[in-house]
Structures are given as structure tokens and as C-alpha cells.
Amino acid sequence: MAENSVLTSTTGRTSLADSSIFDSKVTEISKENLLIGSTSYVEEEMPQIETRVILVQEAGKQEELIKALKTIKIMEVPVIKIKESCPGKSDEKLIKSVINMDIKVGFVKMESVEEFEGLDSPEFENVFVVTDFQDSVFNDLYKADCRVIGPPVVLNCSQKGEPLPFSCRPLYCTSMMNLVLCFTGFRKKEELVRLVTLVHHMGGVIRKDFNSKVTHLVANCTQGEKFRVAVSLGTPIMKPEWIYKAWERRNEQDFYAAVDDFRNEFKVPPFQDCILSFLGFSDEEKTNMEEMTEMQGGKYLPLGDERCTHLVVEENIVKDLPFEPSKKLYVVKQEWFWGSIQMDARAGETMYLYEKANTPELKKSVSMLSLNTPNSNRKRRRLKETLAQLSRETDVSPFPPRKRPSAEHSLSIGSLLDISNTPESSINYGDTPKSCTKSSKSSTPVPSKQSARWQVAKELYQTESNYVNILATIIQLFQVPLEEEGQRGGPILAPEEIKTIFGSIPDIFDVHTKIKDDLEDLIVNWDESKSIGDIFLKYSKDLVKTYPPFVNFFEMSKETIIKCEKQKPRFHAFLKINQAKPECGRQSLVELLIRPVQRLPSVALLLNDLKKHTADENPDKSTLEKAIGSLKEVMTHINEDKRKTEAQKQIFDVVYEVDGCPANLLSSHRSLVQRVETISLGEHPCDRGEQVTLFLFNDCLEIARKRHKVIGTFRSPHGQTRPPASLKHIHLMPLSQIKKVLDIRETEDCHNAFALLVRPPTEQANVLLSFQMTSDELPKENWLKMLCRHVANTICKADAENLIYTADPESFEVNTKDMDSTLSRASRAIKKTSKKVTRAFSFSKTPKRALRRALMTSHGSVEGRSPSSNDKHVMSRLSSTSSLAGIPSPSLVSLPSFFERRSHTLSRSTTHLI
């Protein structure tokens, strides 16, 4: 191919390019400097050549490979067009390009290089497919400068419908295609050459110098300029094992080395090659940081060990080092430690070096505060100026004093309405109001005589301003950075986790910013007749909208923070970094997020205090009462919504526990009343002896049986695993379908039994469902009363007691004898197996005559009574029980096919449940 024929024309010359022309020294990367050209000029000027694919040795025996080659009709061919710049001048311009050409010869099989002729013939463009890039055949082809590809390239092109690619180097697979790598820290040339070769075989590109085009840095150490630049640019820094493991998976289709799940296993951890020690931390914090050090690839040693590379210092506590550090030891602040974990790379130490807190001016000022009383006016004046300077330099934090952890845990959201009228119980905020959104319009004017009403109004404004600052801190320091795109090391939290944590905080911030601005206008232009109550009435609807969603889900927000902090080290580091900032007042995110929970009761206290100091003739007196009422209404909504939220959570638990539970069980008006564990005593709603769970809701009854075989765990897209569903849905029954509740008398053969007489709307007969309660926690009498009360509420009847009837077990052929015996369990298992075979032809026996006799005979053992009445015979029993029969049909209790199936399609009558 070195002496390819050239066709000359007046416009230029075109040559089939020798692969050597596209050597790495010329093009650096295979396709970056190539233009995908059209074949228009080639058809006119290119000599006719023949493209062909040659399967070498084992490649010719792979049926999958041969089948894939038959679907590929095109390959890329490199060409060089030689174009003269001007006629008569010797200057020539080389235009390199890659064109697509048809594969005229499908494929040729070859056993050895020697037997194949025409390797260098200009009449052919040959592509050799080799299965092993380590054997002698590959080496011979490589030395002959032939185009060599691996089977994965062919399979990939066939799958995607792409032409066979051109590469100036042997290309086994495309698992590193479009990746640009740079290496640092390698001292053994042989290892570096091996890694570079593998990258080229997988389609990757190598850069000697680090620049913005480099996608990955492969590092053998954590020092050097390339490492620091990669950290600053957020470029992933990888171990050499990443390349080796990717090469091991070279034959896998659809594998790509840059996929996060694979790549993250081989990222250089932040503390690789680092040995840390810690100073100034509590035992608990130190233990936590030592565990994080090992987790992030580092080691730790006791303080003062000469082998340590870094000393991490708690700069807020440590004022002086206990020893003189060596020149090789980095003494850094704790922010370096947490920052490295957050960015998932070792941060530069120079930005976080620990320095002693030297404040000579302050020391000089404080030194003047001696025990000796100044004897001159000059000393007194200097002392006064020093104290004034200290007071000006002291930044009063807008945050209240930090509470004990026990105080936080003792807070109950449900106690929001428990508002004391003592102003001493309100939080003592700082005296200097600050605003994160804008500065105050003017300094607060002080009336000549400060009234108590003005003092309380000023405190209300100050606390509101501080509260807005706290909300702004939450948003600016926590929420906004977490939501930013292009975070170094990838997103710290998933979007749904961020939404769960912060909820409606931005909406709360917007409302209170407006309230603060209105209060500021009122304070600046103070007048006793100005109405403060109008401000809160103005935004009462906004408060109702924004607060309940956040306060009701605060516990969920708190749990999400704790869970993510344990599972995600970068999030833990992010919280630690921000907690150390002065804006947070050394408080955690959970402690800051609890402020909205506390704010409304605090405002109500101040408004109550303001009302006390407002004259009766002042119009704001009545307005304040309305404002306090509106705040209580908001807190009432919070408590009601909290109860609704808990009720909805219970329904969700039922849905997850019951496999196949209908979706229409979820409804805003529905709540779970009681759960009862029972055993089925009849053939319906499931086989006798089956464990059945009844979920009583305020308007329906969910019937579920215990699963015979537990299904696999449910895994959400976010990796959280739910317990497997332990129950199987049978039927969701509206309470309106329950016509009577039968209290079965206690006998030797029947204990704790009851029955339900139901009328499905799609059937012409009543159905008897009998159960035995298995738990003694809830007495049967209480359960039946509860059930009848909700049935009566559903059908809009006041006489719930009339729904209960007492009956003898013999009348309905109900007994609980031997329910748990081995023989009974074996019998049920045999019966269940036989039903699977003959279900289509089986006709279950029914207690037809027994139930007819119990319901239709004028004298029997059934006595209609209320739960509170004494048992006695009722002579007019036929008339009293006629409602049980419904339709006087001989097939009154024929068991319908409605309960023959183990799961049912919802009937039309259940649509009202939605």
C-alpha cells in the first residue's frame, strides 16, 4: 500500500492513504483531525479499489461474527486529497478525510499471514478481524501496518447499523471511544506503555499534557501539577486498575468504561497516600473522622506520630499546637477534610492551612483592661474607646442560644396549639436585625418616650428579620448548592431527596420576607395607631398554604437528612462544612429546619403580648385578635393535616403489605379504623383454615389472606428496599354490602367466632362469611360494635345495634374445632391441591339447607338482640329476620362464583369508594 497509484487532475490529486500517513505523530487521535468527506470527488478521481474484510484464524469460526458481517455493507476508508494552491506553483495542500465505501467482497477467511497475498496491493483496502491481540498473527499484521479490528467492533457496528470504523491503530473494541486520557505519577515505562496500548485498543485517546479536552486523569500518586489541575477542573481521577478491568470486559456488548457505576469503583479516593491525625475534636467526632478517613482510602495515626502527612485541627477550639510541626506535615483546618470528601478528591492544602489566631490590636486593647483604675482622663477615654471598639466588632448572631439535644428531641409538633401567654417563654433573639435580601431602609427611630407597645413591635420586627435570615441561610448555603448542576463529583443528593428535605421552605421565605418588609415600614414610620394585626391578616392565606406541607412532613425531612448523612459521605461532609460557617451559628441543618415549626407559636406569643399593651380604643386591638385567630387557624390546619398525613401513611402501608390491593383504596376521605387477624371458617372468601386479615376502614372492608409463597422484595429506582408483601388481596368490600353481623355463641367446639352476611351487587343471593378471631388484644364484642357502627354510618342509619344478631354455631354449621391440628392442615393442603386440578368442574358443598332453616323457620335458636340486651327468644322471629333473606328464593345462600375466584375484578358498586 506504500506505493499506491495516484490519479492526477487539474484540480488536484487524490490518493488512497497509507495507514502510516495517519500515524499518531501526525494525527495524535484517529478522528479528531479527520473530515468525514463525501464520495463525490472520489468517484471521479479515485482509482477503483476493492474493500474486503478478512477473518483471521479463530475469527472465521465464530458464527455470530459471520452473521454480523453479512449485515455490514460499508466501511470507512482514509484518503488524502492533494490540491495545488495556485496553477504553476509547487505549493501543495494536503486534505485528509475519511470516506464511506461499499464492501464489495463480504469476507475472506485466513489461517496465516504467509498464505495471504496482496497485503500491500493498492487494489485492496483490507480490514483484518483478529480475536486475540496477543498472538503472533496480530504482531505480524501490526508490523505490516495493516488495519486490525476485534470482533466486538464488528458486532457493535452490526447492532447499531454503522460502517466499520477507520482507526490508525489496532482497535479491538469501542469501550473507551471518545475518552481522552492523561497519565501522571508513573515511573515504570513498561507499565505506562502497557496502559497506553490497552487504551488505544479500546478506542481511547492519550494526551501527554493535561488540558481542557482531557476527560480522565489516570494517576499513580496524589501529587503533581496534573493532579492539582484535574481537581480544580473537576476531572475524574482514576486508578490504573480502571483500564485493566475495562480490558477484561472488552468482549461485553454495550459496555462502556465511563459509565458511573463502573467508573466510580476505580476513582482515586480523596485520602489515598495520606496519613492523618486529629487535634481538638471530641472523642465521638474523632472516631467518626477516623472511620471516614479509612472509608476514603487514607490511614490515621495518633497525634505526634512522625509518619503522619496531615494534622487536621479544629480551628475554633485549638489556639496553639502542642508541638512544633515538621516541614513535611500539613497542618490544615477541618474544612480541608470535609471539603475533600465533598468534592471526592484531595483538596489543595494551601487554601486550608491552619494559622494561629493572632490579633495584636485586640490584645493591646484588652491589655489595657487592667485591675488598676485609670488615674487620668486620657486613660478613661482610651478605655471607653476600646470598649466601644470591642462592642462594634462583636457580631451579634441572629440565632438563639443552642439548645441541648434533649430539648430538641422533646419537641412535639402536636403541641403547636399549646401556646403560653407568658412573654418570658419566647425566644430571646439578638438585638441587631439583619436582612439577607436588602438592608434596612433607615435606622429605626426611637420615640421620645418608648411605649410598651413600641417595644413589643420592635421585638416582633427583630425576630422576624432574624427568622428571614435563617431561612435565607437554609436556602443559600444548603438548598441552592445541592440543586446546582455540574457539581464536582456528581450530584450530592437526588432531586427527590432535596425536595423531601426542604419542601416549601422557599415559599415560607417569600411570605416572611414580605411580612418583614411591611413590619420594617411600620417601625420606620411608627405611629401608635398603625395596625400590626393587618399585616398578618394580609398574609394569613399564604401562611395556610405554605406551613402545613412543611411542618407535617418535618419528621420525614429529618429522617431523610439522617439517612442520607449515614449513607452518603459527601452529603455528610457538605453538612459539616456549612455547619462550621458563621452564618449557621454552628447549628446543624436539622436544627435550622426546625425553626419554621417553632415560628408560628412564637409569633402568636408576641401578638398576644402586643394586644395586652394596646389600648382598648386602639383599632388595632380587634385586628390583633383576628390575627391571633388566623394564626391559630393555621396551626389547627397543621394538626389536622398531620392527622390526615398519618392516616394516609397507614393506608399506604396497607397497600404495600397487600399484594394486588386495588388502587382505589387510596382516597383522601378514607382512614384505617382497625386491623383484625382471623381464620376463615367456611369456604369463602377463601379456603377453610386460611389466615385472613381484615382491614376495617371508615367506609369499606379490605379482605386479604396470608400469602402461601412470599414474593421478592420491591426495589424502588432509588435503591430503597421494601419488605415483601405478606398478604394477598381477596376482596375490597364497601360496608354497605354488609347486611347483618352475626355474633356466634361460645361453645366447646366454637370459640371467638363471628360471621358476616353480605350481598354483592352483582349477585342474586346473600353470602355468608365466617371467621374466628385469633388475637385476644381486641375483644370480639368491641370489634363487632366497631364494625356495626361504621356500617351504620355508611348506610346513614342511627340504630347500629340492630345490625348485630346472636346465633348458635350449629345453625350455620360453624365450628373452630381442630383448626390448628396437623390432620386438619394436611387435609386443607390436599383439598387445595385437588382444587387446582378440578376447579373448573367442582361444585362446592354449601350450608344451603342449614342457613335456610336458620333464617326461615319461625322457631329456632337465633335471637335478635342488641349487644346490651339480655338473650331471649323472639316469637316473631320470621318477620325480624326476613330482612336477612332479601329474596325468598330456594337458592338463597347458593355460593356465587363471585367468591370462587381468589382475586376479583372490582364491581361497579366500588366506584364510589374512589
Curated annotation (Swiss-Prot):
A biological process from GO: bicellular tight junction assembly
Disordered: region residues: 388-449, 857-884
Keyword entries, A-Z: Acetylation, Cell cycle, Cell division, Cell junction, Cytoplasm, Cytoskeleton, Differentiation, Guanine-nucleotide releasing factor, Isopeptide bond, Neurogenesis, Nucleus, Oncogene, Phosphoprotein, Protein transport, Repeat, Tight junction, Transport, Ubl conjugation
Modification Phosphoserine occurs at: S367, S370, S376, S716, S842, S861, S866
Domain of life where this protein originates: Eukaryota
PANTHER family: PROTEIN ECT2
Domain DH per the UniProt entry, residue ranges: 452-641
Listed Polar residues bias regions: 418-429
Mutation effect (T184A): Inhibits interaction with RACGAP1. Abolishes targeting to the central spindle
Residues modified as Phosphothreonine: T359, T373, T444, T846
Domain BRCT: 171-260, 266-354
Cross-link (Glycyl lysine isopeptide (Lys-Gly) (interchain with G-Cter in SUMO2)): K611
Cell compartment(s), UniProt: Nucleus; Cytoplasm; Cytoplasm, Cytoskeleton, Spindle; Cleavage furrow
Free-text note on domains in this protein's UniProt record: The BRCT domains 1 and 2 are required for intramolecular interaction, but not for intermolecular oligomerization. The BRCT domains negatively inhibit its GEF activity in interphase cells. The same BRCT domains may act as a positive regulatory motif for the completion of cytokinesis after the breakdown of nuclear membrane during mitosis.
Gene: ECT2
Identification of the protein by name: Protein ECT2
Start and end residues of each PH domain: 675-794
Effect listed in the UniProt record for changing P734D: More than 10-fold increase in GEF activity. Overexpression causes noticeable changes in interphase cell morphology such as cell rounding and formation of stress fibers, suggesting ectopic RhoA activation
Modified residues (N-acetylalanine): A2
Recorded consequence of changing P601S: Complete loss of GEF activity and failure to support cytokinesis
Record-level GO cellular component terms: bicellular tight junction; cell cortex; cell-cell junction; centralspindlin complex; centrosome; cleavage furrow; cytoplasm; cytosol
Record entry for activity regulation: Autoinhibited by the C-terminal PH domain which folds back and binds to the surface of the DH domain, blocking binding of RHOA to the catalytic center of the DH domain. The 2nd BRCT domain is also involved in inhibition, probably by helping to impede RHOA binding. Allosterically activated by binding of activated GTP-bound RHOA to the PH domain which stimulates the release of PH inhibition and promotes the binding of substrate RHOA to the catalytic center. Binding of phosphorylated RACGAP1 to the N-terminal BRCT domain-containing region also releases autoinhibition.
CDD domains per the UniProt record, alphabetical: BRCT_Ect2_rpt1, BRCT_Ect2_rpt2, PH_Ect2, RhoGEF
